[in-house]
């Protein structure tokens, strides 16, 4: 299972191609499947990664009553889209399909709340959950991450953080601070410079943070 943003088509391409190399089909939500159609129309996604081309399939989440009743629980666009997929010979799958053939699919979800879908899929103990997004940068994101981790423990899954953005991760920043042991720190290109107060404590170093430096403060 991979958690990644619904609009990050570059990352999706990487995920889907990795799945293909391992003889797996990528399963995405109806909403993401519809987004993939848009990306293809804009020339940003190859046709081979559209639902129906054999490498990607749409799955139908449980909604409302908890059963899969398209007429009762699903929006009109969802019903229409499912019908379009069926007309093209690309019938969507359901959680029971993913559960029965777990070695055949890579399931992609797009938000922390989507982890609840896994309760119906019932992943095999030890299954891998990949956080393919940046690490939490604020309290709300920290809470979301912890909530997902709690569910993963209940489901018997193990999590892995896989993200390449050119930015150092939290653990990497702590290690850099520990190794460099600076006397002064000037956060640059940071939306949350105050977070460095926490990082310094975790690194166990004594350091003065200068958020809006004056020339006199830059003298060592």
Can you say where each PLM-predicted feature lies in the sequence?
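Acidic/His-rich, metal-assisted hydrolase cores and their charged scaffolds
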Residues: 1-220
